[in-house]
Amino acid sequence: MKKILLLSLIIIAGCSSSSVPIGMVKIKGSDTMLILTEMLAEEYMSRNPGVSIYVEGGGTSAGVKSLISGEVDICTASRSLNPDEAKSLADYYGSLGMYFLIAKDALSIYINPDNEVKNISSEDLKKIFTCQITNWKELGGNDAQIIPIIRTPNSGTYFYFKEHILSNEDYCPTALVANTTEDVIKIIDKNKNAIGFGGIGYQDDVFHAYIDDIRPSENNARNDTYPITRYLHFFTSKTPSGVVKNFIDWVLSPEGQKVVQKAGFIPLWELSF
């Protein structure tokens, strides 16, 4: 599990015995939220010497499993719990736990910057990822095979896209499968004809396509003009207390939401700087 270390934590090791760690938080889950969660953890630890926050990706499903088993304090998730996960939580803990909306995300469609196609309709997007459209010329682009890239089934983004864009139809069987959002971007960066999807916070090396002539932007996502938006979650197995509660409260505060915005995601409300 990755530990984010800041100078403040290093300094503590050299302080007197009265300076002891005041708490630890373990977090695992959504790859979409990985960079965001790391940034939140880094900023919080810089403000709270003595707190150690461990952050790991692996996908929403993996995070939920670790939450149920008691391995982590917080599961980061880009989707809601499914019925089986909710039942497991209830069986283990006698309740469905707690969930917190911490940010909003526009699910972006990534294409190579050199691709001539810049706008895709929602209908055509579904056809691309179900193999009904297989050539860019059908969308006004070059005569080249479309290479769709999808996430692994342990990803919350995989299920969200399948439900909200594909209407629960099966993904194209020839689609490439990427383990993380960063892997999706790496493939698209090297292949002009590839297309994939992921969070709006990942801006480097790819073009975020317009969907139905609407750009994936903070304002368009906040007011739901952009057609593919979702909330990002923190799940806990019980009512949080101590340092876990303090961290979540800070994430939801104006200071925490400024980090959300800095990471490229959409704060829960408009912020004044």
PLM region spans:
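Sec-dependent N-terminal signal peptides
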Residues: 4-13
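Exported/periplasmic ABC-transporter solute-binding proteins
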Residues: 15-273
